[in-house]
């Protein structure tokens, strides 16, 4: 059993730094981390998973230095992470998710993957994972819904029912 989360616009609203992330101005992005916000319900969701002893891995297309800064700033309790430089191929390719499963959930029968973009859902499905489209931070809701995820949710608290169904 295991959970995989995308970072930006799934766990945290980092939209204030989006233009700097796209241009690779990481110094400016780091300065803005304190202005990011954790979506309502995320801490409850992560605490619930922790109580069930379900390991959590963040898989992101961002560099590890950035990811670690965000995790530390918001005190996310996660098991591990897979970042941009950990694989040669990136989402929507399943390589980052497959790396997470093989390294951190090698005996897992079921892994649930949460993301806000079509590339998250496509990568999850290609890796054979249970895919959950997260609408609260998504900028592409219509096409995200059209990507045929296993589940679609509007609020992080809705993820608790999915986790209970598989791991509860």
Residue spans for each PLM region:
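Active-site neighborhood of HAD-like aspartate-dependent phosphohydrolases
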Residues: 1-41
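Acidic, Mg2+-coordinating phosphoryl-transfer loop and its flanking beta/alpha structural elements
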Residues: 113-152
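Glycine-rich phosphate-binding loop signature in dinucleotide/nucleotide-binding domains
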Residues: 52-54, 103-110, 166-167
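Conserved Lys-Pro-Asp/Glu-containing loop-to-beta segment of HAD-superfamily phosphomonoesterases
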Residues: 2, 94-121
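Short, acidic loop-to-helix structural element flanking the phosphoryl-transfer center
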Residues: 30-57, 68, 72, 94
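Conserved phosphate-coupling serine/threonine residues in phosphotransfer and NTP-handling enzymes
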Residues: 60-62
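A short, structured active-site edge motif that brings together acidic residues
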Residues: 77-91
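Surface-exposed amphipathic alpha-helices with a cationic face
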Residues: 43-51, 101, 121-125
């Amino acid at each position: 059993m295991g959970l995989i989360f995308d970072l930006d616009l799934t766990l945290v609203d980092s939209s204030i730094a989006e233009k700097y992330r796209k241009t690779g101005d990481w110094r400016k992005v780091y300065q803005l981390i304190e202005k990011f916000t954790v979506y309502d319900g995320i801490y409850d969701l992560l605490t619930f998973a922790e109580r069930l002893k379900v390991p959590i891995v963040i898989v992101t297309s961002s560099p590890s230095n950035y990811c670690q800064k965000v995790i530390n700033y918001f005190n996310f309790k996660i098991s591990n992470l897979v970042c941009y430089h950990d694989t040669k191929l990136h989402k929507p390719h399943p390589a980052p998710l497959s790396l997470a499963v093989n390294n951190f959930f090698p005996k897992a029968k079921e892994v649930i993957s949460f993301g806000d973009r079509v590339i998250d859902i496509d990568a999850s499905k290609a890796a054979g994972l249970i895919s959950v489209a997260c609408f609260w931070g998504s900028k592409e809701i219509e096409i995200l819904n059209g990507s045929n995820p296993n589940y679609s949710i509007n609020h992080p608290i809705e993820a608790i029912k999915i986790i209970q169904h598989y791991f509860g």
